[in-house]
């Protein structure tokens, strides 16, 4: 049994979660006609309520009014035992065609939103009916080894949904302070701290110790750190935008860049181009094949 709240996970796991979260965010964006940058938890909740049969229930240990009535549609209220309320933030279970999601409303609003996103992640990605699983989200309790991977994944994806990578990078490159990012996204201090740690480590490739150092300085409103992180984000995105050098092997045995290959082909006769085309066919060199065809047709004009 292992404890879980924030845990360091393998980069392969994290990047898998990014792909899943981005795919879902793109679906929400397409259906709601809201850019991913402008998607907030309320938009995600509405998407799920429109596409799934969900019954939300808020719970406490004593009778109370529903505090956040506008957060979900037609919520119920139930009273649960103190021992369960004191250790459980949320619960998701399948019931025939419906999904029942229970949320502890004694928590701060930021944590309630995160818990809802966490439970919706279970619903969307973890095939509740197939697995016959009931997922219980605990404050800092222990999970069995068979449940822990699901909880790690739900925590990561919920964080990515709460503040998408696009949104986080936009705010970081606009020199937003930690507090301003927190207010803009609606995340808790702890939630944003974890989100930044994961981003700096898994996406920007910093060591855990360096990522923690920068996050702590950012929380202390260190402006130099704000600029340093901005440069790291911009450098990463600029590298992604830079066209990759394409290397092509030609019949003479040389491996040359694409521009050099185009120049080489321009100096060939028609018969030589045909020979080069045969070489491209035989070696399944599709880029060379296309470049030869382009030059062949150009010479025929």
Task: Outline where the language-model segments fall.
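Active-site hotspot residues in diverse enzymes, especially metal/ion-binding acidic/histidine motifs
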Residues: 1-301
């Amino acid at each position: 049994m292992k404890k879980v709240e924030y845990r360091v996970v393998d980069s392969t796991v994290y990047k898998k979660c990014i792909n899943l979260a981005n795919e879902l965010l793109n679906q929400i964006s397409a259906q709601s006609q809201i850019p991913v940058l402008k998607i907030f938890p309320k938009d995600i909740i509405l998407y799920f309520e429109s596409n799934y049969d969900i019954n939300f229930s808020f719970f406490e240990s004593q009778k109370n009014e529903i505090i956040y009535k506008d957060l979900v549609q037609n919520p119920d209220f139930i009273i649960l035992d103190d021992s369960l309320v004191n250790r459980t933030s949320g619960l998701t279970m399948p019931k025939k065609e419906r999904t029942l999601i229970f949320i502890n409303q004694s928590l701060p609003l930021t944590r309630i939103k995160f818990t809802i996103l966490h439970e919706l992640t279970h619903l969307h990605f973890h095939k509740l009916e197939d697995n016959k699983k009931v997922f219980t989200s605990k404050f800092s309790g222990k999970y069995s080894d068979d449940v822990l991977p699901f909880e790690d994944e739900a925590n990561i994806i919920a964080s990515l949904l709460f503040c998408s990578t696009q949104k986080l990078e936009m705010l970081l490159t606009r020199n937003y302070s930690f507090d301003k990012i927190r207010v803009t996204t609606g995340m808790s201090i702890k939630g944003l701290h974890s989100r930044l740690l994961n981003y700096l480590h898994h996406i920007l490739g910093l060591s855990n110790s360096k990522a923690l150092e920068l996050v702590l300085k950012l929380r202390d409103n260190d402006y130099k750190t704000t600029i340093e992180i901005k440069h790291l984000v911009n450098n990463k995105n600029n590298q992604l935008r830079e066209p990759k050098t394409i290397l092509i092997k030609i019949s003479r045995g040389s491996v040359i860049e694409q521009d050099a290959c185009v120049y080489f082909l321009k100096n060939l006769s028609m018969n030589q181009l045909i020979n080069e085309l045969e070489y491209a066919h035989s070696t399944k060199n599709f880029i060379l094949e296309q470049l030869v065809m382009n030059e062949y047709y150009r010479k025929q004009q």
